[in-house]
Swiss-Prot record:
It comes from the Bacteria. This is UPF0754 protein BpOF4_11355. GO terms for cellular component: plasma membrane. Belongs to the UPF0754 family. Its main location: membrane.
Amino acid sequence: MDTAWFIGFMVVIGAVIGGATNSLAIKMLFRPYTEKRIGKWRVPFTPGLIPKRHQELAIQLGHMVVHYLLTAEGLGKKLKSAVFMKAMNDWLSTELLKLLRSELTIGELLEDKLGVKEPKQTLLQKTEGLIEKSYDRFFQENRYKQIGEVLPRGVNEKIDHSVPVIAAFLLERGQALFSSEEGKERLSKMIDRFLLNKGTLGNMISMFLGNERLVDKLQPELMKFMRDDGTKRMVEEILEKEWAKLKQKDVALIEDQLNKEDIVEYMTTALEKNVTFYQWVDQPLCDWSEPFEDMLVINWVPKLVDAVSDLLALHLEGLLEKLNLEDIVREQVEAFSVERLEELVLTISKREFKMITYLGALLGGMIGFIQGLLVLFIG
């Protein structure tokens, strides 16, 4: 009976010592939080392991995260994965549709998000400035060149081929004019002015023939003249010669005849009236964006996501270096309080720490049992 009590006592003592030792070891991972001293003598094992190695832990965690966890290769694979691409595609499509179906205007977006004041007026001013710069640059580069050199080859050829058409058009308009009553009246006035300028000779002709008779004689002859093929060839030759002369003149000749301010203002106003985008600036997106929804969501969004993913994957290593993730992780871990870290670790590993304590008690009890047997055997 004494033997059983002795061995049981040894087992209990061993279990208590083993369990208490492991429990103390676990607590000494974190505690004490600060160094303890008795006079000038530092108490051993203070502070605890984690507080003592807090800075080294932060450095190693930063190194581990950058070189083994958040690597450029791993993030690049994630960016190009089908799951991520689909998630980004769906998210961007949803957000884009939400925006397109809203009451917001392009002007409001520019003003709220980019800080552009009076967006439409600013846009028109930028357009006007761009037109003015283009105007100045064109004449600065081409002022002393011939007009024929400056015009594109296609324009030159088109005008050359259009000369017969222009000649025919002018003759047709002339026939239409002088065959009408209005044209006849104008012709009569022209004859009057002509005869008036001829003095006595003109008066004699008017007196013998009469104005009406002269108009009646001249109008059919004029119509016959304008319908004649020779007249058409003559007009074509005149136009071709004048066009050839014009092409040999310097561009400066045109510049002298133009008013830059009027042209810039005219082109800006024409763009504002005829380019739909200028009108959309002040209209809600939902009023005009519907025809573009499918094109944007089906065609543009996937291409945009793919392009952004490729761009990020290509420059990811450089971006990570510029972000200095290692320093960020280190600073965050250093700023993390040991108390909070202890609470976090214990919350996650509470069951495992208890099992370690129980294991220490079990091993201590087994050692106590063996020691009891040895004592009895030796005694």
